Amino acid sequence: MKNWKKWMIAGSIICIAAGFLLIGIGSSMGGWKNIDKINSRYIHFGDSDTFIGLNFPANTTESQQILSRETDSPVDVGSDSSGEVISFNGKLPEKMEISASTLALKIVPGKSDAIILGGSNRDKMNCYIKDDCLYLEEKNHKPIQKGGEIVLTVPESMDWKKIEIDAEAAYVALQDFSAEEMEFSAGAGSIEASGLQTKKLILSVEAGAITLTDSEAAELEADAEAGAIHFSGSITDMVDADAELGNIVLKLSQSKDDFDYEIDSDLGNVEFDGISVENSVICNKASGKMNLDSSMGNIEIYFEQD
């Protein structure tokens, strides 16, 4: 790895550490805002083929009329403690894009045909649908309530083409989702998931961490600059792993003989079942392939069938 890139990574880590220090100072001086009420937003899918949305940006063609009313009893799409309900008719989104800076977010599948956004910090997020994509974005410069978790519930029957999550300094958790493609990135934050199924899985960390368990993918791209990536499950076709200064650990349900290998350990380390492997090309005439590059980092692969 080139020297300028090493200095860039080191500088990024220093800046991130300084940012956390400033956040801590602000918190200790009373910078947290208490929220008296927890409001949830509901999106209900009907038979119409129009777009749907929640907190749409102003003046967009996809904006729909907000139906808000006070109620003492349950309504079709649900009610919360404040009695505020927002209902839209429309088509299901095909993509989901999540961008979280500092909050704690959980994404779960639900049995109803509604998208529900709840939690004490719900008003710190913009949530809307545009061009068949569900967007959830953290607002800038908003005080957050300590310990407040945001929960995004989406219908479990939804057929996702792509799920993209960016956790800058946030914590994001999800479980039991499938999509054609998934792309997760963690700056200084963390992403935890289990029960994922996808054709293509892209994982990248700077100084953060991504942990996936009991998951399946045909292709995996993993890039760890200075953070950590942990994956357990099965990869059937292709693994492309690059550990610059970071750590990548794969626990695969297959055998070592199920893959061909191109290994470049450089100044780092590559291990199969705890045994170091030097720079080499290994041909098993297998259907799966691995390209492993541990520039100055560490790559560990464990095979359950060996």
Residue ranges: model-predicted function:
Residues 1-8:
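Short, Lys/Arg-rich N-terminal segment immediately upstream of the first membrane anchor
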Residues 10-25:
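Hydrophobic membrane-insertion alpha-helices, especially the h-region
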Residues 25-137, 145, 149-164, 171-177, ...:
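Short linear S-[DN]-x-LW-Φ motif typified by the pepsin-like aspartic protease active-site region
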Residues 98-100, 204, 243:
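Structural recognition of beta-strand segments within beta-rich domains
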Residues 102, 169, 188, 207, ...:
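Residue-level signal for short, function-critical loop segments
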Residues 139, 193-196, 200-202, 209-306:
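Short, surface-exposed interaction patches in beta-rich subdomains
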Residues 142:
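Acidic/histidine-rich helix-loop elements
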Residues 164-213:
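Right-handed parallel beta-helix
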